[in-house]
């Protein structure tokens, strides 16, 4: 099994459905960026009961992985979302927030340490829940009218070479997953 280090000492976010779900329902990994200027502000927002938003994991700029919501619960990360015939993707997914100011505040490349953590955490989740590459998506894939994250600087091409998600090469016309 992939070796990863996850910090579970952070106070959990209160923003999740309290009834545990069946692990067989977990079919997706959804990547997000925080879209906030400061990492600390993003963590505070994701753990504040008034914000009504959370994720299962938070990846800091230094690569540290924090647990915000235990995987057995439905975190509130996807909002109004759909993929093919499924609606409310929160029910079927693990949400991963990656610290990045996003398009609103000088969108930057993700750090190498963050990408290493994305890779390790993804491999762990893929193995644990038997998640297929075609179901490793960005927030923008499941909420295209509302969201841009994780954005064009997210290393989909690199990750797809490691069997995490797909890279859509228009020139080669391969690795496409059509929804019809």
What are these regions (language model features)?
Residues 33, 98, 140:
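Residues immediately flanking
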């Amino acid at each position: 099994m992939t070796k990863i280090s996850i910090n579970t000492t952070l106070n959990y976010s209160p923003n999740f459905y309290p009834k545990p779900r069946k692990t067989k329902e977990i079919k997706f990994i959804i990547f997000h960026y925080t879209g906030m200027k400061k990492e600390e502000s993003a963590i505070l927002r994701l753990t504040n009961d008034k914000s009504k938003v959370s994720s299962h994991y938070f990846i800091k700029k230094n690569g540290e992985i924090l647990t915000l919501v235990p995987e057995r619960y439905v975190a509130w990360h996807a909002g109004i979302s759909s993929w093919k015939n499924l609606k409310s993707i929160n029910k079927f997914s693990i949400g991963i927030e990656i610290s990045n100011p996003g398009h609103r505040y000088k969108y930057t490349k993700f750090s190498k340490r963050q990408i290493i953590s994305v890779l390790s955490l993804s491999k762990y989740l893929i193995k644990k829940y038997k998640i297929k590459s075609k179901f490793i998506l960005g927030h923008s894939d499941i909420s295209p009218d509302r969201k841009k994250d994780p954005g064009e600087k997210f290393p989909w091409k690199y990750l797809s070479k490691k069997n995490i998600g797909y890279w859509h090469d228009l020139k080669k016309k391969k690795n496409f997953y059509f929804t019809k």
